[in-house]
Amino acid sequence: MITLKTIKKKYNIEQKNTKLSIGIDFGTTYSLVASALEDNIYIILDQNNRALLPSIINYTSKKPIVGWEAQKQAINDPKNTIISIKRLIGHSYDEINKLYPNLPYHLTYDKNGILSFIVQDNLINTINVSSEIFKTLKNRVNTIFNQKILGAVITVPAHFNDLQRQEIKKSAELANLNIIRLLNEPTSAAIAYGLHLNKNKIVAIYDLGGGTFDISILKLNQGIFEVLATSGNTNLGGDDFDQLLVNYIQKKTHFSYSKLDFIFQRKLLYLAKSIKIKLTSHNSVQFQFNNSKMHTITRFEFEKMIEPLILKTLNICQHVLHDSNTNLTHIEEIILVGGSTNIPIVQRKVSDFFKQLPLCTINPEQVVVAGAAIQANMLTNGSKYNNFILLDVVPLSLGIEVIGNIVEKIILKNTPLPISKTKTFTTFKDKQTTMLIHVLQGEHKLVNKCQSLCRFVLKEIPKKPAGKIIVLVNFQIDVNGLLSVTAEIKSTKIRKNITVNASIPIKKYRN
């Protein structure tokens, strides 16, 4: 079994030719950083012995305040204190308003079409906001080690789409980090556990965090980590449990959330968060809000409240078992990941579903960053952790729009990475000289039910009758799950390339 250690003091790397690499778990609620060095995995602490960094950024001062100090401002300055940024990245303004209608922020777009916040009369996009978390974690590392960070592995939800992955990558690069791999969170947890799971086996990784849910089925076979299938929901997590508690408190105290100002809304949210945490270890909790009378909520009430959301995750688990061509009898280990798996009913329901007790010998809040640190060390140094091969998969199908508002799939979900695939298309009208390539991600057949990633135009098509000109469309996805698209006129070799990235305006093309 791997051993996790913590470190907060200056550390000199003694092994010769050892390059410093780090793993970062960029979370909805908290973020962490770790490094695998000299046969140990170190969770890097701040000066106050804290491993967790709240993923919160406050913009009241000239310089952004990040983490615990920002959390102190979250209630009294909600408009300028951004929480759960991970849930907002890669989304359009309309999507955010639909998903989270009561946010206190003043949202707009920057000149590149990226969702942005107006704070203290400044325009700050989601990439810049996220980068402050990476900068803070990087500074934490720099205060400990005597070497430059040569590479970082950053974990992302397995079900993140291409725009979200690109935005995280750009945020980390803005913090001057060299990104050597984007690693899916469940796969990262499997790496942390898999190093001591010597037998060949099939494992399930159930990852329920603050903002997202992932489930992955992996086959471990003589040092090969093969992801058989993955699925999830990027808008389901502990934050949703908080919102259910907010609704409960409103009913008990007769306060209408929508009629409260933003400060009281944030106070109510943080009261809900504290109740949730206390109910993890207590059978009941007393509370009051804004001088209301004292009320009591029991764990039983809370569990009934959140049970439908937990059942949603188990329904996704059922689908991923089907996608992986496995059944419950094949699953030999179920691994819990994410802070929300500390909730007793989550553990019980997962155990009942998989018909076995979950494995949680590594702290669920630290296992992902541990795996990322191991992967980073392997990619930069080799070391004792170089005896495994990682085979991940495409989380969502990718294709292009064709006539009839239909998506023609080019790469299907759960295809092993990396992958390059080409499909043939033809012109659909006489003397057609251009072709619009609209790239989409998702499982639905209809365009408006899928995620629009980008559009570009292939020009200089020879004027021929409909169907006579052949266009080859190639999709290439690298090990990070990042997409490049090429469209080529077969007869003339004229081509157009594009790498889908977060700087492509999304406000115009979201469906």
From Swiss-Prot:
InterPro entries: ATPase_NBD, Heat_shock_70_CS, HSP70_peptide-bd_sf, Hsp_70_fam. Coiled coil: none annotated. Chaperone involved in the maturation of iron-sulfur cluster-containing proteins. Has a low intrinsic ATPase activity which is markedly stimulated by HscB. Involved in the maturation of IscU. Gene3D superfamilies: 3.30.30.30, 3.30.420.40, Actin, Chain A, domain 4, Substrate Binding Domain Of DNAk, Chain A, domain 1. GO terms for molecular function: ATP binding; ATP-dependent protein folding chaperone. This is Chaperone protein HscA. It holds the Pfam family HSP70. Keywords: ATP-binding, Chaperone, Nucleotide-binding. The keyword ATP-binding applies. The keyword Transmembrane helix does not apply. PANTHER family: HEAT SHOCK PROTEIN 70KDA. Belongs to the heat shock protein 70 family.
